[in-house]
Amino acid sequence: MTLMHPHMIKLLSLSGLTLGLLAASQGVRADEIKAPTFTAEPCCSLCPAAHDAKNYTTRYQQNFTTLVQAQGDWLFRTQEDLRTEFDTTPSGYKRMQQLHDAFKAKGVELVVVYQPTRGLVNRNKLNPEEKAKFDFDKALGNYKTMLGRFAKMGYVVPDLSPLTNEQLPDELPAHDFYFRGDQHWTPYGAQRTAKIVAAKVKQMPEYAEIPKREFETKRSGRMGKTGTLHNMAGQLCGTSYAIQYMDQFTTEPKGEAGDGDLFSDSGNPQITLVGTSHSGKNYNFAGFLEEEIGADILNVAFPGGGLEGSMIQYLGSDEFQKSPPKILIWEFSPLYRLDQETIYRQMMALLDNGCEGKTAQMSASTTLKPGKNELLVNSSNKDLRNANHQVDIRFADPSVKTLQATLWYMNGRHEDIKIEKPETSDTDGRFAFELRTDEDWASQNLLAVEVQGPEAGAAAQKVEAKICTRNVFPAGGQQTAAAGQ
């Protein structure tokens, strides 16, 4: 093939490169929207606007389509809380299998904590009409089937179905699994989940090799929760709901002074928790796990991280690369799509630390200016087919959270890719990802990489980039195809 002159890239670039950007998943940003201030009395029914899906216009609002009024201050979302389908696409199953096998090759066992929905757990809070419409048996059956699919791929999967159809006596204090007007579980929900997860972890062969430690949990105060569902109702209807107050808990090593850690072996936990904001400190899920499992846990989850935020940040860290855990607990909810290619391309690249310590097929170091910047050009016509290669781009400024790039190929095709890290994450300025291999992309030969520079007037950005041979992980031989049936 005749090599395309680099200047030809500029001609091709005249087409709208911003179209078709492969946006990375944005998790539900639970704590971003502040509670609006209203003077209305607490309400007991939603306005008509809340029942019309067309009024949920922004990406964030669409996570709440559409709100349903339940008993008292309880609200539910029809698409997420009252879903009856739990599934992904064939490509999603294929990628989940590859991810499991890659972790297994690194000596890491993955435990999947697949949360039951609010509808499955708290359906008895629905009003009679909505409860009759919600096919609980179908939802529970499909949820349990999905747990089985994860297990068939080789994941360790605690069965959380006993937590469903909760019926707490009214005379007891409010220890509900979920908040009335928020998608997060309460600390009591986190605790009940942790007990089941811990029982499963203790059955794993790896558990026997992990140093044990006793923990105890104490009530540490109260938190006021202005729920995300309540906030959305306020935006759509101008109504307000009462703040829900809930016990908070902290977990500490049993009988140890505050400086006891200096002399313990807890500096290198062999269990790590990655996950969503459900694993944040407000709900003490990590603490309850430590108490129930009886071992130190490194919690790297953060609010607003979504499905992949904390996982990607952790895989690129020294903690994972230098001392990978024996057990990795991955907590996420069914609302996240499991077939997002850009996420897997990053995780698979970072599992073996991208291009770190590998021979670079191409490399460059430059300062980005506003607009498009030609970063790498395959001027010697090397064999850089997608199936065998990955990209590792590092900004000198660790606070850079967005990479917008165009990958050009020898036959004139191109891919626009956009990777956005959560604003809440403590980032490292690094973006590593495999070249695209879905559909018919595996045989494409890379010509050039263009990267979008800073906004006009902003400081220039220093960046380094490498192309190297991608990681090859042995397949685990699980029955992926059967899982997707």
Swiss-Prot record:
EC number: 2.3.1.-
Top-level EC class: transferase
Compartments reported by the entry: Periplasm
Signal sequence annotation: 1-30
GO-annotated cellular components: periplasmic space
Protein name, per record: Alginate biosynthesis protein AlgX
Family: Belongs to the AlgX family.
Active site feature: D182, H184, S277
Keyword Glycoprotein: no
Assigned keywords, A-Z: Acyltransferase, Alginate biosynthesis, Disulfide bond, Periplasm, Signal, Transferase
Pathway: Glycan biosynthesis; alginate biosynthesis
Principal cellular location given in the protein's record: periplasm
Chain spans, region SGNH hydrolase-like domain: 30-355
Subunit and interaction comment: Monomer.
Comment block on domains: Consists of two domains, with an N-terminal domain with structural homology to members of the SGNH (GDSL) hydrolase superfamily and a C-terminal carbohydrate-binding module (CBM) that may bind alginate.
Role, per record: Plays two roles in the biosynthesis of the exopolysaccharide alginate: protects alginate from degradation as the polymer traverses the periplasm, and also plays a role in its O-acetylation. Probably has acetyltransferase activity in vivo.
Record CDD domains: AlgX_C, AlgX_N
Native source species: Pseudomonas fluorescens
